[in-house]
Amino acid sequence: MTASWGTLGHLWNKDVAIIFIRPQRYTKEFVDESDTFTLSFFNDKHNELSYLGTKSGKDEDKVSNVNFHVEMVDGNPTFKEAKEVFICKKIYVGKLEKEHFLLPEIYKKNYPLDDLHYVYIGEITDVYANK
């Protein structure tokens, strides 16, 4: 999955990554099944990342179509081509709620199908950098 909604910060005295995943995303199954998730950052590869963001791994082997190479880091999948990889331990999962939106136009613009994102907060436990 290519993510564009997320943030890094400090919460509950921990360095954290906060990510948002829609319920219909294939990636959600994998994140839900594991206690950890990875975030992979790239210097370039914009065309490849755009392709990955518009295709589902449920329908095709999209990773091989962009010639990325999966590798395991501390038992977690990432890509050899990534510049940096964050290993995150899940510490919170919740779902956005329609009634909590204070600006109705945000909800209307982003959720016409009422498919509200799930929020995952992960403690950043390791960071790896490729040279």
Model-inferred region functions:
Residues 1-131:
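Active-site-proximal mixed secondary-structure blocks
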